[in-house]
Amino acid sequence: MAIPETQKGVIFYEHGGELQYKDIPVPKPKPNELLINVKYSGVCHTDLHAWQGDWPLDTKLPLVGGHEGAGIVVAMGENVTGWEIGDYAGIKWLNGSCMSCEECELSNEPNCPKADLSGYTHDGSFQQYATADAVQAARIPKNVDLAEVAPILCAGVTVYKALKSAHIKAGDWVAISGACGGLGSLAIQYAKAMGYRVLGIDAGDEKAKLFKELGGEYFIDFTKTKDMVAEVIEATNGVAHAVINVSVSEAAISTSVLYTRSNGTVVLVGLPRDAQCKSDVFNQVVKSISIVGSYVGNRADTREALDFFSRGLVKAPIKILGLSELASVYDKMVKGQIVGRIVVDTSK
């Protein structure tokens, strides 16, 4: 297919500035890169932070955000092997890494000190054509819907890796704090598919309904419960074996240590601005509780997360909007009005 010189994309020139839906140049792939015709992109809370500039990590400017892009390979650099024109490919948060440092050698590529990040340090998937390092680009099976698979590329991989990091077994209880947003709605399904019992913590009747529809076992509305810790203890017959914190509430993170059982694990995923993780040292030591951070996933985690999706074990509850509507999506994110995951169609 003929590749145009210009395309539609959303770009901003300063943090918090206007999100401009406009014609921008189509990027040229470097020798190690793919050029992907992005059909759909999920919208992640990280994209909001990149625009606001409120993380202690510098972005490039101007910037095209987005890091859950699903599309088709239309060109590639001369050093690329193992890919063909027409393959389905995904743009992840980790666009590229050095592949030679200690972290990369240990398959901890997201922790590479030279990591290149889609929609942050590398123009991302809120455009019709985007580049991705051929080594890190996700291989999407041909039998899947590109709109539905888009959120798996970050949200799905992230929660799947977080659940693996909890080191629990089938039949154990996992509590998901922030259960029905874009991350939580996928965490519920991955947890069920991995054989765990799922308790969800969130707010609102709409989210309670979604939690049950996705197969969750017990839902706590934190705005209605009189004693959340006591309710978790009662529901799980002795508190949770693990907690996955995907909320962006500092208070929720600190509270989660209180409803984790002895030798359990608290996994931190959500990144609230300027937050601290506070834990009573005596309680943590005597109960031998582990508090760990989990940051996206490596290539194997991506492959495994996509396999769960392609087998129909997880499905992102998505709403599709046009790329031109991205500013309104950010506004709803700020107000906490997103249920499930928003996916933008780059053709609209």
UniProtKB/Swiss-Prot annotation:
EC identifiers of the protein: 1.1.1.1
Subcellular location: Cytoplasm
Record's keyword terms, sorted: Cytoplasm, Metal-binding, NAD, Oxidoreductase, Zinc
Enzyme class: oxidoreductase
InterPro entries on file: ADH-like_C, ADH-like_N, ADH_Zn_CS, GroES-like_sf, NAD(P)-bd_dom_sf, PKS_ER
Principal location listed in the UniProt entry: cytoplasm
GO molecular function, one term: alcohol dehydrogenase (NAD+) activity
Cofactor-binding details, from the entry: Binds 2 Zn(2+) ions per subunit.
Binding, NAD(+): G178, A179, C180, G181, G182, L183, G184, D202, K207, V269, G270, L271, R341
Coiled coil, from the record: none
Protein name per Swiss-Prot or TrEMBL: Alcohol dehydrogenase 1
Gene: ADH1
